[in-house]
Amino acid sequence: MGWRIALVVALGCGNSQSVKVTSGADTDVSAPVPDTTATDSGDAMDSSAPADSGDPPADPPANLIINPGFEDGESPWSIWGGAERVPEQAHSGTWALKTTATNGSEQVVEGLEPNSVYRLSGWGKNTSADPLLIGVKDYGGEELRAVFTEAEYREDSVTFTTGFAHTQAKVYAYKHAGSEPAWADDLRLQYEGPSDRTLVWSDEFDGEGALDDSKWTFENGFVRNEEVQWYQPENAFQEDGMLVIEGRAEERPNPGHVPGSTDWRTSRETITHTSASVTTKDRYSWQYGHLVVRAKVTNHGGTWPAIWTLGIDCEWPSNGEVDVMENYGGDILANFAWGTDARWTPSWDSSHWPVADFGPGWTDDFHIWEWEWNADRMVIRLDGAVLNDASLTSTINGSAACAGENPFQQPHRLLLNLALGGHAGGSMADLTFPTRYLVDYVRVYQ
């Protein structure tokens, strides 16, 4: 677990209004999404029925955007920067959105299904080569845009998949540059179906007592970072549908003590605190995909919970480390680390976010951390918001070990642990024991 910190600031523009188009969705992506089409009666239509049945064709999927053609005033659109709703140049009806430079309109659509496919379409025309953009962002993935430079109205679309924790998206029409006008009209957002991302490995922690030893092994003893705790298996267990990792104050002799030793692991005569670190080492590893973990942290001083991965080949840090979540010193961290020219000395791509900025009561709830990983790029998200990302073109090991290799182009294994004190955990003077780190589920999709 790394702890070099570099501040990352998220910037945004414009104000948004939010429209809830359904009663909401449970963010538990294990719930199936029906692959059916609704008939006028509200019953599901059997897709295997003959097309020429004599019945009228089914209605098209509902448009989830409210006031998509700007016919009913500005609401719920947020029109900003000099863009305006005009009674001319409409594709259909009477009204359209007119944009010029660095202005546009946006709308937040809520009530979407997580891990599902949607299509955003719209009509646009332009009087210059400076593009008009109709796009979508803040849905749990890359911002996507359709580009319009033509003088006549043309329809275009983008298709996107919502994140595992995301039930909303921001749609917009925007012109970035130039002074000549462009127009947008008849935007449409429709549900296309469930995502094709397949669940390939998971633990829902639905049992009681000991963990599934076909999925997990344990770290033991004093392990790293001069942390206070002694890791032992009995501090990790299933309870009430969750993984509990418990830090305890308990004292006994250190079985590895060596009198006169200068190694911090063996110089300690006594174990004063215990905790657990569970790992999929020798059980499961994967290369590329989407890791999703729902967990709850306390943000207490002296604690250092983490969700992280290590590459299966080469020594640290040249095997690659991904800190999907670390929590210490009042911050949430998201880090990538790889090897340099000096042994045991990592190159860090780090970000940290003060828990206080997330608002009151944040630690009372569970939250969803994601690591999206492919051969080109990695992204870490918290509740759908990007905390850190990295291009794999920049994560090449130096000469110390596995020189010239990319440690993020090999399988990785998962670790979940609760450290106490140490280099980053800080003072435990005000910490009450036992203290718990809770994990609801771990899922890997490909």
Each language-model region and where it sits:
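GH16 jelly-roll
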Residues: 187, 191-446
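Ser/Thr-rich, Pro/Gly/Ala-heavy low-complexity intrinsically disordered linkers and tails
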Residues: 10-60
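Extracellular and organelle-lumenal recognition/adhesion modules and their flexible linkers in secreted
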Residues: 54-194
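Secreted/luminal cysteine- and crosslink-motif detector
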Residues: 14, 116-117, 123, 315, ...
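Sec-dependent signal peptide recognition
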Residues: 1-8
